[in-house]
């Protein structure tokens, strides 16, 4: 137990250092280059290194196409924040434009990676990812409907995507459940069927979207463009709380790897644990895709690669996957921002992830031979 805890701390610390380094370097890159020192001071000023602080819970109206929907968020009121004398232009660029996008990217990447790690263990299949239970396709239907039919779906893009993701995930679960038992194979096949159906609905909406096809396609490809602090305030609490719950069930996930019968023998309530893991992973993924769109490969490639390095122990795998996923998505978005056309980050993750994943598969096959 102590050895596993020590490994988790060591690997998490290393991944945390990597994440911070990627965040800082990413903030220096853009049309207006800014030095690393200025970025660090601007970040400290924006995040306000405080003498004191108070935290309050409130509801925030998420920006929508039409109408509005209250969304729980946290407000941190700082007392006497320290100032670092950063030029006003640099402070605006870093604090208002780059940092919200970078922090949201890290949040989304972490949520997709930790959900992917959980679902790969859940299905005992390294090819599983958050989209396998219909979360991404459900979010796509909700978001595209809100974009193309704002007079019908009046709650807006992010709330519609979040609701669509959860409805799809729990529909998959309801279809696969019989007499209180949910076979993993049935759940997997139900997810594929629902995902295919929702993909057809999304395609129909896009084909008939007219002038709204561009924003719909951008959302479907995944983008962090235009991210602001209120997006971070809405997404971060959901991801943090959900990730904490998943980490608390790391031991049960380790036991489930041995098989459901062995897990029963060792005192794990298998059906209850599976329901909880699926629900929380779906909520965490929904919070991510509702703000960033359908970004692929993060939840597939990151936990798979991390597992090859740190092993299958979820006490180590989950935190390291989350931190590495955040770093990976921020790095991919930095590449997107550095190009002249600034493509959606989902294109970059696919270009990076697909060849790397094929390499991993080929490498494993060669070793097996």
From Swiss-Prot:
It comes from the Archaea. It is a multi-pass membrane protein. The chain crosses the membrane at residues 9-29, 62-82, 102-122, 130-150, 152-172, 187-207, 229-249, 283-303, 316-336, 341-361. Its main location: membrane. Keywords: Cell membrane, Membrane, Transmembrane, Transmembrane helix, Transport. Pfam families: FecCD. GO terms for cellular component: plasma membrane. It is found in: Cell membrane. The keyword Glycoprotein does not apply. Belongs to the binding-protein-dependent transport system permease family. FecCD subfamily. The complex is composed of two ATP-binding proteins (BtuD), two transmembrane proteins (BtuC) and a solute-binding protein (BtuF). Required for corrinoid utilization. Probably part of the ABC transporter complex BtuCDF involved in cobalamin (vitamin B12) import. Probably involved in the translocation of the substrate across the membrane. This is Cobalamin import system permease protein BtuC. It comes from Halobacterium salinarum (strain ATCC 700922 / JCM 11081 / NRC-1) (Halobacterium halobium). The gene is btuC.
